[in-house]
C-alpha cells in the first residue's frame, strides 16, 4: 500500500509518499508561499531535486492538486494513477483530551477538531485546512489523523495538572498536553530496536531539539512527563521561544511597558529564546556555535542558558523515574550538534551518563556514550513522517 503523509502549515504543505511494502520514500517535498505571490513546489524523487514555480497565489486545495499532478506526471511522477494512494495520513498538532491515539478521520472527528481549534490556534486551523483539501481532491481515499499530543495522553494527573483553580481544568481543559509526541515515540521505539530490548523495560529520556524543543520521560513504553505544556511555549529554551518563565512577567510587561496581548504573545513566541539572548541576530544554533567559537560572549551565554535548562529537566526526569537507561538526542540540533550534547551531559556522570568525545563528534545516528557509561546515550535521526505512515497503514489495513 502507498501512503501519502501531509503536514499542512499556514502557508505551506509538506508531503511524503511512502511505499509501505518496504517503508521506502517514493517522493517528498513542500509547497511554500501558499496564499502569497509566487508560490513554489520543491520536489525530490530519489536523487533528483526539482523546483516548480507559479505566478498566481494558490490555496491549500490547489497546492495538494499540484502535488498530486506532479506525483502522477509522466516526466516526474512515481505513480501512474491516484488510485494507487491507499490512504492519507495527516499530522495534527493538538488532539486535546478527545484523541489519545491516531484515528480514522470521520465527520465526527472533523467536528471535534473544529471544537478544539482554539487549543492550538497557530497549528490546528491549517492542519484542518489540509484535511478539507484532501476531502475535496481525494474524496474516496481514507484519511487518518496522527496527533502530536497523543503520545503524552498517558501522563498521570500529577504531571499534567497545573496548580490553578481546578475549575479551569474542568470547564476549559487548561492542563499540560505536551507536543512532539510522534517524534518522541519514534526515537524511543528505534532506540529499543537498536539495543535489542523491549520498550517497556527501558527508562528513556528523549530530547527533541529543533527550532522548537521538548524533552520527554518515557517509562514502561509510555510518556509520563514532558516539558511542553498547554502550548508549545512551555519548557526548554528554544530558537525563538522563551520556554519556562515566571508567569508574572507577561503581566508586568503589559502593566509597566504598556504592551498588548498580541505584542506579549509575539515577544514570547517569536523574539525570545536564543534569538532574544543574542539581540535578535539569529535563532540558528549553528550561528550561535560559530560565534561562541569566535569568542562572542553573548553567544556563549545563550548556549549556556540553553544547555542548562535541558540539563535540569534531564535531572528531574531521572528523579521521577528512579534513574535512566537511555538518553536520546534528536531533531536538527540534537542530531547535529556535538557541542550541545557535550555541554548538556557534562557533570551528569553521577547519573551514569558519560560521553565518548570521539563518538560524540559524529552526526546522525550513533551511540555516543563511553564504553563504561551506565546510561546509553544515542543520537537518533527522527522520522515523524514514517511514524504517521505506519499509524495510517495500521488503521486503514484494519478496514479491509
Swiss-Prot record:
Mg(2+) binds at residues 7, 384. It is an enzyme of class 2 (transferase). ATP binds at residues 14, 208-212, 284-286, 332-336. One of its GO terms (molecular function) is ATP binding. Its cofactor is Mg(2+); Mn(2+). The active site is at residue 148. It is found in: Cytoplasm. Its EC number is 2.7.2.1. Mg(2+). Can also accept Mn(2+). Keywords: ATP-binding, Cytoplasm, Kinase, Magnesium, Metal-binding, Nucleotide-binding, Transferase. GO terms for cellular component: cytoplasm. Substrate binds at residue 91. The record marks 180, 241 as: Transition state stabilizer. GO terms for biological process: acetate metabolic process; acetyl-CoA biosynthetic process. It catalyses: acetate + ATP = acetyl phosphate + ADP. Signal peptide: none annotated. Pathway: Metabolic intermediate biosynthesis; acetyl-CoA biosynthesis; acetyl-CoA from acetate: step 1/2. Belongs to the acetokinase family. Catalyzes the formation of acetyl phosphate from acetate and ATP. Can also catalyze the reverse reaction. Homodimer. This is Acetate kinase.
